Amino acid sequence: MATAQVIAFDESIKFMESIGIENIMQHEADLVEYGQELLQKNNSVKLIGSPKNKGGVLSFTLEGVHPHDIATILDEDGVAIRAGHHCCQILHDKLNIPASARASVGIYNTKDDLDKLNYSINNCKKIFNLKWI
């Protein structure tokens, strides 16, 4: 029996209930809005998806840089993102992009994390000698 996992799951539920699901959802929505505002100012970043009714995810591409390269550079800066098709290759085909980068936010993230994401994306631009803002 997976006793430790059951206990951890129970504690996770208690943690989320102590904060409140609505508060968690609002926190994520606020962070996504802030992140979108930051990244929209960057002329090389293309945000993917509608700003409305979004979960805690910022999907994007960076002109001239493959998402796996973005993920590697951001990792060196201590920023964790995902790169690839994210189990939706058909969507990527429809959008005519080879892959995308995806930053996820949750209750444990802050605006400082998104500032660091933006800083690291600008670092990618420097490394790949892309047009600066």
Regions found by a protein language model. Give the residues of each.
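Pyridoxal 5′-phosphate
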Residues: 1-133
